[in-house]
């Protein structure tokens, strides 16, 4: 932000974890960080509903800075990167992943039943588990490639 503002442009940060919380079952944030990242050419939204990059898989956390600074997208918009893969769908213990490819502008429910995912994890809240199980992240081939490249570097 300092760089942007030092060049005379405005910068408004939007944290990744801000949510509207007006509807306890909406599971939505105040800003669509994943959509913005796709339009910036940084990656794609997978069948799991996770934002995925070729370099880091879904092991990313997004925040956004809105600015009036003229910027060029990092790359071409990737409309889908999962193809026919259904590993996450088949591994999801909640059955929350439909197996459909993400289509820009389509409702999230066409690819992921967020309420079903959340309900599955609520069954484990008494043992101190988090809000998501992460199995879709664990089995994603994009994350596997990252683990293999990390192991090769060691």
Residue ranges, per PLM feature:
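Catalytic cores of enzyme domains
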Residues: 1-154
């Amino acid at each position: 932000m300092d760089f942007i503002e030092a060049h005379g442009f405005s910068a408004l940060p939007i944290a990744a974890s801000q949510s509207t919380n007006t509807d306890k079952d909406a599971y939505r944030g105040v800003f669509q960080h994943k959509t913005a990242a796709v339009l910036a050419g940084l990656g794609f939204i997978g069948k799991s509903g996770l934002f995925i990059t070729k370099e880091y898989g879904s092991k990313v956390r997004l925040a956004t800075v809105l600015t009036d600074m003229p910027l060029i997208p990092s790359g071409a918009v990737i409309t889908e990167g999962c193809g026919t893969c259904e590993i996450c769908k088949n591994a999801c213990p909640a059955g929350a992943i439909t197996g459909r490819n993400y289509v820009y502008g389509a409702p999230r429910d066409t690819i992921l039943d967020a309420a079903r995912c959340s309900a599955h994890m609520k069954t484990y809240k008494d043992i101190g588990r988090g809000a998501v199980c992460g199995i879709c992240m664990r089995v994603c081939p994009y994350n596997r490639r990252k683990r293999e490249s990390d192991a090769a570097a060691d």
